[in-house]
Amino acid sequence: MKLPAFLSLLALVLLEAGTASLPKERKRRDEMHGEGDSYVVLGNYVLGPDNYDEVIDLSDYEGLMDYGDQLPEAKVTNLAPPTGISSAQSTMTPRTLSLKPTMIRPTELGVLGSPNSHGLPTCLICVCLGSSVYCDDADLENIPPLPKTTTYLYARFNRIRRIRAGDFKGLTKLKRIDLSSNSISSIDDDALRLLPALQDLILPENQLAALPALPPAIEVLDARHNQLQSSGIQPEALRALEKLQFLYLADNLLDSIPGPLPPSLRSLHLQNNLIETMQTDAFCDPEEHKHSRRWLEDIRLDGNPINLGLFPSAYFCLPRLPTGHCC
């Protein structure tokens, strides 16, 4: 009987002690909450700025961060194919690519022009600015295909030897052709004659022995430093050029003054040829004494073996005497 009574008395004492400590603990927690976030309750520990190092031992920092075997081991496995799809269906067969190139040919002439002998469009070999095409020093051996809108062509300092009949076909707006410093020795008759708008033909420093048939709209013809002979200029060929104003044939192999000359001519350069004589009607019509070539003011015959003093009646219709050796 004494033992049970003793245990009951001990239980009552402990219960009373625990009840008495509750107000103190609650008061302590209220004080910590009143001070803001300076204290944190972690289980049975009260963590604050004054006892941080007492609650958590920082000397074994690596041990604190060592999770050991707590993390599960990740295993890499293959995903099973979706339900309803067999393994044969899930395997894709790569498509075999053909190594043979496919050639695509353009159906129309592009803005860059058709391919030339180099295999590239003309405007990639030359420089195309508006209606002007510049092919200077491009190592060309032929006239390249040109855009239909070409108005001015410059193909100087190349290796062109021949101008063919179809080189300028369809270029109805072409006004100027400059082929200086090439190796042109022949021009087909229909290469230039059918160009309705051609005004300036510049051909110095080539190897021409004869002039081609020219369109009637031509105004400037420059064929200096060639191998032109008098037999290479067809009779009446120049008279038909009713708009021709400037004719430059210096430094050739001419042995006579070409003619008859058109009335529109303003300048005639024949210096450094082989001219020894001239016809009395080379410039003036001896039967028309009142006729005057008032536009022809620039005639150059210097550098020829001719003596201009021997032909005084040949200049009466001219506003100025020719330049050359006299007396």
UniProtKB/Swiss-Prot annotation:
Disulfide bonds join C284-C317. It is found in: Secreted, Extracellular space, Extracellular matrix. LRR repeats lie at residues 149-170, 173-194, 197-218, 219-237, 243-263, 264-285, 295-315. GO terms for cellular component: extracellular matrix; extracellular region. GO terms for biological process: articular cartilage development; bone development; collagen fibril organization. SUPFAM superfamilies: L domain-like. Residues 111-148 form the LRRNT domain. Keywords: Disulfide bond, Extracellular matrix, Glycoprotein, Leucine-rich repeat, Repeat, Secreted, Signal, Sulfation. Residues 1-19 form the signal peptide. The modification Sulfotyrosine is found at Y61, Y67. Pfam families: LRR_8. O-glycosylated. Proteolytically cleaved by MMP1, MMP2, MMP3, MMP7, MMP8, MMP9, ADAMTS4, and ADAMTS5. Proteolytically cleaved by MMP13. Ocular tissues, cartilage, ligament, skin, muscle and testes. The record marks A20, S21, G110, V111 as: Cleavage. Its main location: secreted. Belongs to the small leucine-rich proteoglycan (SLRP) family. SLRP class III subfamily. Homodimer. Inhibits angiogenesis in the vitreous humor of the eye, and therefore represses neovascularization. Binds collagen fibrils. May be involved in collagen fiber organization via regulation of other members of the small leucine-rich repeat proteoglycan superfamily. This is Opticin. It comes from Canis lupus familiaris (Dog).
